[in-house]
């Protein structure tokens, strides 16, 4: 199907419902698996979602849809992503491999957040849309690697 405003509205509603369901699943997982490292796995998993959420709200703003709420959500998601990244970086629980994954995520994150907030003009935002999509995928890959490293059996081995 070709992109349309009606399709974008439908996607918005569906993705918000999916995000709520995913958040509930993560909370249930953390409740069952009370190890401290599992909390970090959940946080890193949320980073994946937040990276995609920021791109989604960027695109909504560039299309003139949900402009004020999208701006608020975009800024909230960036603040949350940044705070969680710092929290994981400061954790004494992470291994050398996780620290390397965090460094890679930080390298991918900086240019992504810069382009997300480079302009509030929808025309300029649309001109940067392909770059946002590319950088979003790079951040997503880096967050996936972080989750993989945190969930690795070697991360769970006693020091």
Locate the predicted segments by residue.
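Mature extracytoplasmic or organellar-lumen-exposed domains after removal of signal/transit peptides
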Residues: 1-159
């Amino acid at each position: 199907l070709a992109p349309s405003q009606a399709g974008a509205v439908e996607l918005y509603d569906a993705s918000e419902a999916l995000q709520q369901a995913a958040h509930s699943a993560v909370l249930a997982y953390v409740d069952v698996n009370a190890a401290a490292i599992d909390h970090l796995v959940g946080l890193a998993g949320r980073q994946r979602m937040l990276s995609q959420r920021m791109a989604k709200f960027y695109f909504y703003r560039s299309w003139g849809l949900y402009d004020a709420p999208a701006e608020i959500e975009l800024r909230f998601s960036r603040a949350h992503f940044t705070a969680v990244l710092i929290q994981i970086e400061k954790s004494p629980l992470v291994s050398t491999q996780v620290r390397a994954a965090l460094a890679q995520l930080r390298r991918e994150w900086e240019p992504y957040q810069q382009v997300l907030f480079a302009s509030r003009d929808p025309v300029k935002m649309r001109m940067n849309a392909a770059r946002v999509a590319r950088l979003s995928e790079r951040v997503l890959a880096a967050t996936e690697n972080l989750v993989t490293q945190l969930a690795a059996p070697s991360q769970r081995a006693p020091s």
